[in-house]
């Protein structure tokens, strides 16, 4: 057997010099593995004279324990050093100036839509949606626009080749809702509508909210009270309002609602903001509701119009030009 003392001394020096866990593992295998130096020494004990085996065995076992402890301590030391190095590399300098994060916000039209629908939701109206590609019956005929009715020309409709169309108002949602729900009912429809018109105050695509109430006792006075409450809640102030007689095929009588709007110079002018009226009996008949028993009122508004008034925007097209400098004012 080779000198166990010199083997241990050299092994301890090699362990102390190891600079990585991989090198340390190679040393462990070379010393204590199945074919390692210390293991080989133990296997050779049987070849020694009986009187030498005990002392040699104790020396080898002691060497094995010393090396096992040295390997463990060196491994822990290397792991601590690796952890310290990683923490140093990942350290955050809290004295550095912070970064300004990008800030997102809702589009002003979305904000206005949510404000309008929220107000009517608190008044007990259920929000309903419908398709933007409509058929003629839901968009016109069910709403008392018979074929060749001159009022159809007011809507500047986009037609598809198969006779379908891009809805010109959200009133078709009301038709579908009345077909699926029995009175009494309260609902609002909100979404995009399309008309072939484009200028400072009109867009080929715009947003509309329409409301409908049908029961046995609704009157024009109820309609006026509802709209007065809505205008007050939306603008958070009281307005003088007037209802002017107007024609809409689906209501009778019909009216347009003006509010006394204060100009920047302090003067006041009447500003149209809503259309409304009592639901025409023909519309109720078309959806299977008895007009002798039930009455109802309906109203509608352009969302962009209310957004322009709320945010002081003079050109409707600014909402759809995607100019971040403009939109971030509302974030």
UniProtKB/Swiss-Prot annotation:
Enzyme Commission number(s) of this protein: 6.1.1.20
GO BP: phenylalanyl-tRNA aminoacylation
Main location, first listed in the record: cytoplasm
Catalytic activity: tRNA(Phe) + L-phenylalanine + ATP = L-phenylalanyl-tRNA(Phe) + AMP + diphosphate + H(+)
Cofactor: Mg(2+)
PROSITE patterns per UniProt: AA_TRNA_LIGASE_II
Cofactor note: Binds 2 magnesium ions per tetramer.
Localization per Swiss-Prot or TrEMBL: Cytoplasm
Gene3D superfamilies in the cross-refs: Bira Bifunctional Protein, Domain 2
Keyword annotations of the record: Aminoacyl-tRNA synthetase, ATP-binding, Cytoplasm, Ligase, Magnesium, Metal-binding, Nucleotide-binding, Protein biosynthesis
Binding positions for Mg(2+) per the UniProt entry: 252
Keyword Cytoplasm in record: yes
GO molecular function: ATP binding; magnesium ion binding; phenylalanine-tRNA ligase activity; tRNA binding
Root EC class: ligase
Pfam family, one: Phe_tRNA-synt_N
InterPro entries: aa-tRNA-synth_II, aa-tRNA-synth_II/BPL/LPL, Phe-tRNA_ligase_II_N, Phe_tRNA_ligase_alpha1_bac, Phenylalanyl-tRNA_Synthase, tRNA-bd_arm
Cellular-component GO terms for this entry: cytoplasm
Ranges annotated as spanning the membrane: none
PANTHER family linked to this entry: PHENYLALANINE--TRNA LIGASE, MITOCHONDRIAL (PTHR11538:SF41), PHENYLALANYL-TRNA SYNTHETASE (PTHR11538)
HAMAP family xrefs: Phe_tRNA_synth_alpha1
Family the entry assigns: Belongs to the class-II aminoacyl-tRNA synthetase family. Phe-tRNA synthetase alpha subunit type 1 subfamily.
Descriptive protein name: Phenylalanine--tRNA ligase alpha subunit
Gene this chain is encoded by: pheS
């Amino acid at each position: 057997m080779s000198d166990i003392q010199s083997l241990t001394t050299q092994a301890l020096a090699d362990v102390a010099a190891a600079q990585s866990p991989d090198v340390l593992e190679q040393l462990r295998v070379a010393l204590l593995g199945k074919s390692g130096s210390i293991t080989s020494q133990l296997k050779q004990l049987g070849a020694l004279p009986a009187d030498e085996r005990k002392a040699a065995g104790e020396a080898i076992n002691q060497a094995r324990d010393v090396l096992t402890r040295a390997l463990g301590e060196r491994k822990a030391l290397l792991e601590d050093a690796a952890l310290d190095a990683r923490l140093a590399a990942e350290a955050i300098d809290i004295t550095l100036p912070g970064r300004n994060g990008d800030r997102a916000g809702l589009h002003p039209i979305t904000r206005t839509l949510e404000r309008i629908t929220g107000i009517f939701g608190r008044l007990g109206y259920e929000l309903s949606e419908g398709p933007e590609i409509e058929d003629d019956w839901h968009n016109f005929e069910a709403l008392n626009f018979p074929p060749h009715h001159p009022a159809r020309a007011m809507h500047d409709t986009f037609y598809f080749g198969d006779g379908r169309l891009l809805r010109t108002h959200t009133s078709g949602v009301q038709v579908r809702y009345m077909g699926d729900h029995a009175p009494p009912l309260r609902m609002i429809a909100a979404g995009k509508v399309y008309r072939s018109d484009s200028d400072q105050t009109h867009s080929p695509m715009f947003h509309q909210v329409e409301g409908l109430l049908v029961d046995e006792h609704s009157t024009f006075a109820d309609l006026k009270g509802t709209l007065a409450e809505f205008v007050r809640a939306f603008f958070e102030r009281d307005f003088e309002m007037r209802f002017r007689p107007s024609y809409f095929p689906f209501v009778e009588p019909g009216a347009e609602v003006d509010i006394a709007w204060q100009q920047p110079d302090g003067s006041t002018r009447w500003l149209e903001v809503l259309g409304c009226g009592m639901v025409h009996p023909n519309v109720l008949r078309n959806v299977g509701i008895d007009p002798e028993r039930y009455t109802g009122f309906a109203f509608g508004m352009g969302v962009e119009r209310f957004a322009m008034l709320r945010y002081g925007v003079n050109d409707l097209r600014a909402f759809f030009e995607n100019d971040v400098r403009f939109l971030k004012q509302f974030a």
